[in-house]
């Protein structure tokens, strides 16, 4: 049985079901597995995506039945992904794009957030829990819609999503504001993503709020990547990318493959670290940042400084200064809950921390880094389209730019393409040298005409949908929202 414990308290031990149902540990730590399971990579590479997902996920979720996981992954990664779950597209030479935006909401978050509601419902069954689950989600754009789509009308669950007002693309905002479902709510928060995320974390850490909700038979949980249930499905597509390179004869088994990941909250790239620790021949994990390059600075110097200027960029899902999942990596590298707790205390109190030189050296064994300016992002979108005929969004362009700097001769580079270019039509259109209309839907149409590509139907359909949610609150209001729920 795989056990999980908190990054800040090694003695706080839970099962996978408990980790997924609870989300965050009581003292604010994140749940991590006690060990990295070793797998038969060659055998896994023979499997189709749903079967591969069941095999990888079952290594960690050992208190779930294998039959349940097989059925859950089969129903999740089939029709909804249009036959393109974990699809690897050749771009140029031995650089590839792992297209993770063929799911229902056109972003990589679908891989976790379409499966995670099934995992939560089953976790409650495993634990014989009957309370209502209130899920609070802070989002910089894609997680919000992914979570709303996954959890809407799930029995026994209520979900409230908080996004920074003006901090997403208009398409991302409309995806959330038009969400259907009787159990969903969406709020714009004054401030940036970190304000929203801090507000949500504060509610999770408030024992008085938990007690009041418990009186009404309500328990809090998270759908952000601080929840283990968000992270584990993302490990799968690293194996899928490697398998496709094998099948295409681009590598022989055992060859290393590098991955470049556009990174905000550090969850997507951390999943690659887990894949590597499980035995997948991952070479370098390249962390690509936008102008909010706090992670590039940390991976270069060992000092994490969240107190810095915040930039609103064309890649809003990465406009993050407090990168939550880095805490998990720090735990795995140091092995010390006390050390991690101390670092997080420093971050909370002073806005920064510095790791020991040997800790940074251990991290650099697996990770590299780089960042892209706004000008470089636009140039990369245009270059990829004009040179390779490859149309990408702003976040993917951040990674393509960094990947080109970090490419090793003879080692394939897989860039994780995290969102459809049609989620950010104005930015992509302008990067291609066109004047973008103010309206996102007109821009979407213009992008279709300019490139001959078709926008995903779910995005085009937003134009006809009525907006349901328009409330704007201060970060302090997140607690009031939580306390407003009744069983």
Pin down the residues of each PLM region.
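PLP-dependent amino-acid enzyme catalytic core
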Residues: 1-487
């Amino acid at each position: 049985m795989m056990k999980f414990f908190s990054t800040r308290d090694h003695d706080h031990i839970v099962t996978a079901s408990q980790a997924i149902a609870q989300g965050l540990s009581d003292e604010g730590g994140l749940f991590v597995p006690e060990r990295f399971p070793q797998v038969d990579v060659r055998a896994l590479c023979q499997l189709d995506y749903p079967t591969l997902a069941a095999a990888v996920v079952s290594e960690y979720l050992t208190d779930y039945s294998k039959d349940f996981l097989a059925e859950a992954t089969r129903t999740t990664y089939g029709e909804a992904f249009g036959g393109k779950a974990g699809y690897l597209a050749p771009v140029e030479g031995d650089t590839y794009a792992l297209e993770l935006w063929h799911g229902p909401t056109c972003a990589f978050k679908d891989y976790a957030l379409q499966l995670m509601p099934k995992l939560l419902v089953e976790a409650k069954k495993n634990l014989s829990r009957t309370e209502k689950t209130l899920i609070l989600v802070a989002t910089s754009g894609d997680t919000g819609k992914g979570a709303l789509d996954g959890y809407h009308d799930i029995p026994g669950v209520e979900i409230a999503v908080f996004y920074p007002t003006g901090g997403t693309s208009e398409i991302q905002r409309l995806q959330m504001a038009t969400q259907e479902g009787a159990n969903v709510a969406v709020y714009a928060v004054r401030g940036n993503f970190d304000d929203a995320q801090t507000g949500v974390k504060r509610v999770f850490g408030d024992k008085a709020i938990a007690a009041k909700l418990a009186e009404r038979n309500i328990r809090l949980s998270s759908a952000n990547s601080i929840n283990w249930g968000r992270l584990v499905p993302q490990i799968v597509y690293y194996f899928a990318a490697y398998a496709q390179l094998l099948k295409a004869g681009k590598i022989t088994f055992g060859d290393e493959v590098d991955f470049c990941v556009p990174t905000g909250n550090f969850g997507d790239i951390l999943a690659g670290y887990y894949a590597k620790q499980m035995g997948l021949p991952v070479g370098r994990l390249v962390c690509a940042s936008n102008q909010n390059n706090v992670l590039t600075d940390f991976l270069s110097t060992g000092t994490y400084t969240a107190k810095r200027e915040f930039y609103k960029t064309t890649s809003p899902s990465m406009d993050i200064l407090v990168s939550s999942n880095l805490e998990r990596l720090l735990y795995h590298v140091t092995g010390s809950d006390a050390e991690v707790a101390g670092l997080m205390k420093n971050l909370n109190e002073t806005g920064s921390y510095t790791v020991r030189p040997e800790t940074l050296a251990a991290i650099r064994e697996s990770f590299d880094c780089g960042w892209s300016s706004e000008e470089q992002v636009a140039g990369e979108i245009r270059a990829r389209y004009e040179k390779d005929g490859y149309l990408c969004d702003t976040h993917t362009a951040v990674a393509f730019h960094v990947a080109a700097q970090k490419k090793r001769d003879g080692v394939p580079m897989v860039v994780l393409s995290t969102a459809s270019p049609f989620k950010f039509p104005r930015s992509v259109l302008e990067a291609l040298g066109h004047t973008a209309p103010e309206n996102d839907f007109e821009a979407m149409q213009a992008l279709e005409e300019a490139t001959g590509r078709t926008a995903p139907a779910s995005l085009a359909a937003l134009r006809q949908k009525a907006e349901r949610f328009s409330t704007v609150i201060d970060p302090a209001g997140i607690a009031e929202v939580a306390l407003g729920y009744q069983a």
